From Swiss-Prot:
Pfam families xrefs: NAD_binding_8 (PF13450), SE (PF08491)
UniProt name for this protein: Squalene epoxidase 3
Gene behind this protein: SQE3
Membrane topology value: Multi-pass membrane protein
Tissues expressing the protein: Expressed in seedlings, leaves, stems, inflorescences and siliques.
Main location, first listed in the record: membrane
Pathway(s) annotated for this protein in UniProt: Terpene metabolism; lanosterol biosynthesis; lanosterol from farnesyl diphosphate: step 2/3
Length: 525
């Protein structure tokens, strides 16, 4: 009997020790799998490497928005992993003019030195040309330091400077790779799956993923309801060694059928962008585009730079790019948000894209600042919702102005639209508040929705008033009524797409009143 009891006791003791050992081994392995960077799984022959939890924020894309955001959040102490498809210097024909309002945001983010040593040019306003007449519109900069002005430059040089500055921060990791998808679990974005430069499939995880992979984003569909429109295309040229009629000014020619833009991008180069309405373009390869530019566009170019324009066409370096517009319509997704052109686009006529992006980054930085720990998904989601609301007044004003101004500047066979175009040019030529007000909107110095609407309809009323002086007629009254109707038909659909309540009455939306989190609410749950 005694030996049997002894054997049972030994079995129980051995079982207990083995169970304890197995439990400890399992615990160590689970801890190791969570903390070791680069644990490997092989599925269907594809190598997937899952990164550890040493990242606070993943940024997809390192263009203007992504690079500026990486530096901003890195400077705030966040551990940032940036994944960019191509880290070589970009070569684009847009994103070359930063409005004064955007430059102020650049200063606020501590990135103003990124426009130094790249041969950037100061921009002090615009010159408008129409039917042989011209008017100069200066930015209202009297209340600002002498350094504050617009800046124009090679986009790639500017982006590279910001990338370099972000990369200098020890907590920012810049990696070349192509993000193929967002990693989602139970409706929450956990990170991204991407291919490295060498073709290796990797996954990276973080509490927050910010997608800013540009106008051709392949990730936006899961984070917003994209309604992309392409009203026109830009045809880009570089004019060399020529002087613009008004130095340090952007030049807008109200041509037929659409605007032509000129602005300096270095001390010896001038960018020309010819807007071509619709989706169909003359062929560049066949020479049809060059013929179109020489015969249809060149006669409308100011005489001082016409020879340089023709010379640029003959050199043959003609590039095109679709002009996209897309109102912001986010899908609130825990763990992720959109930024930059991936989220919101407007016609580039007014050069407002970088101003919107930099303004968004300032808002996002200030919202995330009190959140010590981003792993609290509920708290983080509330602040992302606040971001989408707080950005609306500024972004929507710039977006609406770009869309409305482009439609007004288009030539049209309709008498009412043509009268609106003439009224706009003459209204801006009046000077005083009639020019400083709209230019303050355009420059991002006073992006107020109500001011935009007031000036837009002031142009329409100015046009109607001219029709009724000295004596009104039935024909002129009818034309005036159609002019008001045309103006309404231009601006109201844009405002509706942007969101009337968010644009004009944001304070009626609870998300705008988001108090800083208490220490307990910002700690992980």
């Amino acid at each position: 009997m005694a030996p049997t009891i002894f054997v049972d006791h030994c079995i129980l003791t051995t079982t207990f020790v083995a169970s304890l050992f197995a439990f400890l081994l399992l615990y160590v392995l689970r801890r190791r799998s969570k903390t070791i960077h680069g644990s490997v799984n092989v599925r269907n022959g594809t190598l997937t490497v899952k990164s550890g939890t040493d990242v606070d924020i993943i940024i997809v894309g390192a263009g203007v928005a992504g690079a500026a955001l990486a530096h901003t959040l890195g400077k705030e102490g966040r551990r940032v992993h940036v994944i960019e498809r191509d880290l070589t210097e970009p070569d684009r024909i847009v994103g070359e003019l930063l409005q004064p309002g955007g430059y102020l945001k650049l200063i606020e983010l501590g990135l103003e030195d990124c426009v130094k040593d790249i041969d950037a040019q100061r921009v002090l306003g615009y010159a408008l040309f129409k039917d042989g007449k011209h008017t100069k519109l200066s930015y209202p900069l009297d209340q600002f330091d002498s350094d504050v002005a617009g800046r124009s430059f090679h986009n790639g040089r500017f982006v590279q400077r910001m990338r370099e500055k972000a990369s200098l921060l020890p907590n920012v990791r810049m990696e070349q790779g192509t993000v193929t998808s967002l990693v989602e679990e139970n409706g929450i974005i956990k990170g991204v799956q991407y291919k490295t430069k060498d073709g290796q499939e990797l996954k990276s995880f973080a509490p927050l993923t910010i997608v800013c992979d540009g106008c051709f984003s392949n990730l936006r569909r899961s984070l917003c309801k994209p309604k992309v429109e392409v009203p026109s295309n830009f045809v880009g040229l570089v004019l060399e060694n020529c002087e613009l009629p008004f130095p340090n000014h952007g030049h807008v020619v109200l041509g037929d059928p659409s605007p032509i833009l000129f602005y300096p991008i270095s001390s010896s180069e001038v960018r020309c962008l010819v807007d071509v309405p619709g989706s169909k373009l003359p062929s560049v390869a066949s020479g049809e585009m060059a013929h179109h530019l020489k015969t249809m566009v060149a006669p409308q170019v100011p005489p001082q730079i016409r020879d340089a324009f023709i010379s640029a066409v003959e050199k043959g370096n003609i590039r095109t790019m679709p002009n996209r517009s897309m109102p912001a319509d986010p899908i609130h997704t825990p763990g992720a948000l959109l930024l930059g052109d991936a989220f919101n686009m407007r016609h580039p006529l007014t050069g407002g894209g970088m101003t919107v992006a930099l303004s968004d980054i300032v808002i996002l930085r200030d919202l995330l600042n009190p959140l010590v720990d981003l792993t609290n998904k509920e708290s983080l989601s509330k602040y992302i919702e606040s971001f989408y609301t707080l950005r609306k007044p500024v972004a929507s004003t710039i977006n609406t102005l770009a869309g409305a101004l482009y439609k007004v500047f288009l030539a049209s066979p309709d008498d009412a639209r043509s009268e609106m175009r003439r009224a706009c040019f003459d209204y801006l030529s009046l000077g005083g508040v009639c020019s400083s007000g709209p230019v303050a909107l355009l420059s991002g110095l006073n992006p107020r929705p109500m001011s935009l609407v007031l000036h837009f309809f002031a142009v329409a009323i100015f046009g109607v008033g001219r029709l009724l002086v000295p004596l009104p007629s039935v024909k002129r009254l009818w034309l005036g009524a159609r002019l008001i109707s045309s103006a309404s038909g231009i601006i109201f659909p844009i405002i509706k797409a942007e969101g009337v309540r968010q644009m004009f009455f944001p304070r009626t939306i609870p998300a705008i009143y988001r108090a800083p989190p208490t220490p307990s609410s910002s700690s992980p749950q």
